[in-house]
């Protein structure tokens, strides 16, 4: 029976905007009613201010990175760590923090984020492509990040994938154009699995799961 994941798993739902993260988070809330749901930036006053500045303000990328990092450290200490024995499902994590911090050296960003944040046991990355992204962006008003263009967003997607691998996180990559119910079942099957989720021991490990690659066989 689905929706009964074992305690003590930290799952990050990742992907650039328009990939359906919010839809999956809403569906997961219905499935895992006792889980702790959270997001980055965090939902407190500080996190809300940072989110608004990132989407609509004119701060430099480096300044935004430092603010996000401070929020991530506080979020980890006050919410993630104290609830380590629960199923935690987060809309974004340090993976996005590293991926969007393009003004910082990649390895430096990895080191800093490792120092202040908990590493997810599982990263679910909802992936898009140029055609899908172009169509979905045309249907909405774009914020500061989305206004940087399709090429930039696809570069961020590649950095999300690279960040998860470099952090040694087991990763489930799913094409975002699959039916939302199918995506949900794929995610739940992985959350409910009895195996240890953190299987990738190094950046060279090939053990990260990919629904995309399995589907192509």
Q: Could you tell me what each predicted segment is?
A:
Residues 2-5, 131-217:
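NTP-dependent small-molecule kinase module
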Residues 6-10:
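Pre-Walker A (Motif I) flank of P-loop NTPase domains
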Residues 13:
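Hydrophobic anchor at the beta1->P-loop junction of P-loop NTPases
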Residues 16:
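P-loop (Walker A) phosphate-binding loop of NTP-binding proteins
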Residues 21:
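Conserved lysine of the Walker
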Residues 24:
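Hydrophobic positions on the alpha1 helix immediately C-terminal to the Walker A/P-loop
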Residues 36-114:
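ATP-dependent small-molecule kinase phosphotransfer cores
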Residues 97-158:
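A glycine- and Lys/Arg-enriched "phosphate-lid" helix/loop adjacent to the NTP-binding pocket
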């Amino acid at each position: 029976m689905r929706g009964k994941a074992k305690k003590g798993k930290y799952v990050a739902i990742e992907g650039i905007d328009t990939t359906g993260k919010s839809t999956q988070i809403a569906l997961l809330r219905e499935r895992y009613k006792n889980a702790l749901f959270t997001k980055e930036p965090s939902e407190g006053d500080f996190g809300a201010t940072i989110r608004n500045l990132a989407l609509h303000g004119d701060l430099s990328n480096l300044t935004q990175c430092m603010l996000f990092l401070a929020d991530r450290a506080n979020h980890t200490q006050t919410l993630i760590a104290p609830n380590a024995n629960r199923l935690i499902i987060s809309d974004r994590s340090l993976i996005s923090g590293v991926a969007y911090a393009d003004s910082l050296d990649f390895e430096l960003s990895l080191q800093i984020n490792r120092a202040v944040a908990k590493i997810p046991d599982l990263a679910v990355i909802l992936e898009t492509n140029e055609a899908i992204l172009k169509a979905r962006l045309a249907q909405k008003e774009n914020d500061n990040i989305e206004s940087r263009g399709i090429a930039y967003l696809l570069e961020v997607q590649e950095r999300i994938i690279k960040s998860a691998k470099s952090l040694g996180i087991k990763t489930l990559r799913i094409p975002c154009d699959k039916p939302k119910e199918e995506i949900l079942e794929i995610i739940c099957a992985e959350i409910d699995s009895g195996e240890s989720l953190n299987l990738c021991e190094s950046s060279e490990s090939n053990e990260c799961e990919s629904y995309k690659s399995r589907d192509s066989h």
